[in-house]
């Protein structure tokens, strides 16, 4: 029974990971620019996003496995759940967690920078003329990546030595063996993870809070777009007025622009440029309305119009969900600030829940019927992940106030896609902490586990509360009952995250106070978005129209060049055949 139950839990996790790979692929293919597709960049981004989401969504599996050892109705362990069996489950989970966390760090700090530099080193002309080989690109990218490799080594060395600073002889091999037996290697990974979560929290506070406020509102208050009939009519009127003014100027000079004054010539040149822009804008609007499009695109546009009311409904639902998330985070942070038994000394760890948290309650109740809690947790994580993407799209990739890259659907360069993926990886690490320790702390620590709070008689191996249901209590971290210590098993993720804040209290303080910054920015952005009416970015629209026109011209030129090349090669082939026949 135990083997079947654990196998089913892992099977559900495998299905979820496959779904995550599909979600990551859709995200990457939606945002990348079609003109600059790079297979190595696409594959790296998909693997990175899938791995991080798989790390976060291991939490319900962790909770389900440790909770499966308990009979919550009786507050005692299952008959098969011996201590050795529980230790085996925990060891398996630890191996998976350490593998995923190490892979996350490797992808974020080594692989993504390497692929970024590898793409930057690519020179299309030099590659076609065989002046640049793949080995040269690889070596140049590796030289730039060495600095990131050094950062990783320094991170692990700091985490390896700082917690166990000792005097005396510590430079030999025996000392390293002693550190490993004391599990200092695990502390090094803990320090590296704590630092990455700290960096991720800065991005999480800025981007996820912004996206959490904007995502539902953009679904409800959809701004004017190129599909708007009003914009199409306005463009037609502007184009008509422009051409009328051009005719007036051309009539004044009778077709000879040299007869015009310098002021009129400048006006005519401006009108000609404006006419080209308006024509491109009109063509883009026609394509958005399905004109000159294939039947599949026209069908998609019709479906979009039909499902517009459902978009409004989903916006309202997401707004309520975002508000519940905000309230749950606020309640937990207040609870931690008031009732944490160790305050800043251990990162405001909460012994047990003192304030009702709606999201935590939903997860604890749904965890009694696996995989209901897994479905809800997955939807919550994907909602926060989508909010992070919306936040990055709205704010852009910036250095201080300078926008370096813009993230837009169908217009994101490979470099921007790699940077956005690295940012999302760090954000998801911070999200792992927030969902486990802030949104649903009781669920992520013990799930639905309970224990029988009564004295153990000499003839009993476990307390029996079958007749005393009122003595069955939920497990908590400060339960001082001997029965609780024998029965309750904390999840691996809660143990690992609490170890970060216990061993390095400054990380815990940053993690805690960053939540208040998140709540404040969300409130500010939400109020601003409600009061501000969305406007159409005409400059961006004109750039999109110009880019589409360039793409069309390049495609036509490429087609003509290929046709010409085929004609030349076929002519040479026929000439060679004639020469051979004559010979």
Swiss-Prot record:
Give the UniProt entry's GO cellular component terms. Answer: vacuolar membrane
Compartments it resides in: Lysosome membrane
The answer on whether this UniProt entry bears the keyword Membrane reads yes
Report which superkingdom the organism of origin falls in: Eukaryota
Disulfide bonds, paired cysteine numbers: none
Segments passing through the bilayer: 8-28, 41-61, 95-115, 145-165, 188-208, 312-332, 347-367, 375-395, 418-438, 506-526
UniProt-annotated stretches for the region Disordered: 541-562
Q: Which GO terms describe its molecular function?
A: cobalamin binding
**Major place of localization?**
membrane
GO BP terms in the entry: protein localization to vacuole
> What residue ranges carry the coiled-coil annotation?
none
Comp. bias (Acidic residues): 541-552
User: Known Pfam families for this protein?
Assistant: LMBR1
The family line of this record is: Belongs to the LIMR family. LMBRD1 subfamily.
Its biological purpose: Probable lysosomal cobalamin transporter. Required to export cobalamin from lysosomes allowing its conversion to cofactors.
What name is this protein filed under?
Probable lysosomal cobalamin transporter
């Amino acid at each position: 029974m135990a083997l079947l139950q654990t196998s089913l839990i892992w099977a559900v996790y495998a299905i979820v990971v496959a779904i995550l790979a599909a979600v990551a692929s859709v995200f990457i293919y939606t945002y990348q620019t079609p003109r600059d597709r790079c297979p190595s960049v696409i594959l790296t981004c998909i693997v990175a996003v899938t791995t991080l989401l798989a790390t976060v969504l291991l939490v319900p599996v962790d909770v389900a496995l440790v909770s499966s050892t308990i009979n919550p109705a009786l507050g005692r362990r299952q008959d098969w759940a011996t201590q050795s069996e529980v230790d085996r489950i925990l060891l398996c989970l630890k191996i998976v967690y350490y593998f995923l966390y190490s892979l996350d760090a490797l992808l974020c700090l080594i692989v993504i920078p390497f692929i970024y530099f590898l793409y930057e080193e690519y020179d299309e002309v030099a590659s076609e003329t065989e002046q640049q080989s793949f080995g040269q690109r690889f070596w140049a990218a590796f030289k730039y990546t060495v600095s990131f490799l050094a950062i990783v080594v320094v991170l692990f060395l700091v985490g390896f030595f700082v917690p166990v600073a000792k005097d005396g002889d510590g430079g030999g091999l025996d000392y390293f063996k002693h550190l490993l037996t004391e599990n200092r290697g695990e502390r090094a990974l803990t320090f590296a993870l704590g630092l990455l979560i700290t960096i991720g929290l800065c991005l999480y506070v800025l981007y996820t809070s912004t996206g959490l406020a904007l995502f539902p509102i953009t679904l409800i208050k959809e701004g004017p777009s190129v599909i708007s009939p009003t914009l199409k009519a306005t463009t037609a009127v502007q184009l008509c007025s422009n051409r009328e003014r051009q005719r007036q100027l051309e009539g004044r000079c009778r077709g000879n622009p040299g007869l015009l004054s310098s002021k009129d010539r400048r006006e005519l040149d401006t009108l000609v440029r404006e006419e080209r822009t308006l024509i491109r804008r009109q063509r883009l609007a026609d394509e958005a309305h399905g004109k000159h499009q294939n039947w599949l695109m026209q069908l998609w546009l019709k479906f979009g119009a039909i499902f517009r009311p459902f978009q409004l409904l989903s916006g309202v639902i997401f707004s309520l969900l975002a508000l519940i998330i905000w309230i749950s985070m606020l309640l937990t942070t207040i609870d931690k600030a008031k009732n944490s038994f160790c305050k800043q000394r251990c990162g405001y760890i909460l012994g047990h829940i003192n304030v009702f948290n709606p999201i935590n309650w939903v997860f604890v109740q749904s965890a009694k019927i696996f995989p209901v809690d897994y479905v809800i947790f997955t939807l919550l994580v994907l909602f926060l992940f989508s909010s992070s993407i919306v936040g990055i799209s709205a704010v852009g990739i910036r250095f201080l106030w300078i926008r370096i890259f813009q993230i837009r659907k169908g217009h994101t360069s490979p470099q921007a896609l790699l940077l956005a993926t690295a940012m999302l990886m760090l954000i998801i690490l911070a999200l792992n902490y927030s969902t486990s320790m802030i949104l649903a702390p009781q669920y992520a620590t013990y799930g639905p586990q309970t224990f029988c709070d009564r004295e153990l008689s000499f003839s009993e191996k476990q307390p029996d509360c079958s007749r005393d249901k009122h003595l069955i209590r939920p497990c908590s971290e400060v339960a001082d009952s001997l029965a609780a210590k024998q029965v309750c098993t904390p999840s691996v993720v809660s143990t690992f995250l609490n170890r970060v804040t216990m061993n390095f209290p400054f990380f815990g303080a940053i993690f805690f106070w960053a939540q208040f910054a998140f709540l404040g920015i969300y409130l500010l952005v939400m109020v601003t978005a409600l009061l501000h009416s969305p406007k159409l970015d005409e400059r961006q629209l004109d750039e999109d129209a110009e880019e589409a026109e360039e793409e069309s011209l390049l495609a036509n030129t490429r087609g003509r060049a290929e046709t010409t090349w085929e004609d030349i090669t076929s002519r040479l082939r026929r000439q060679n055949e004639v020469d051979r026949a004559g010979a």
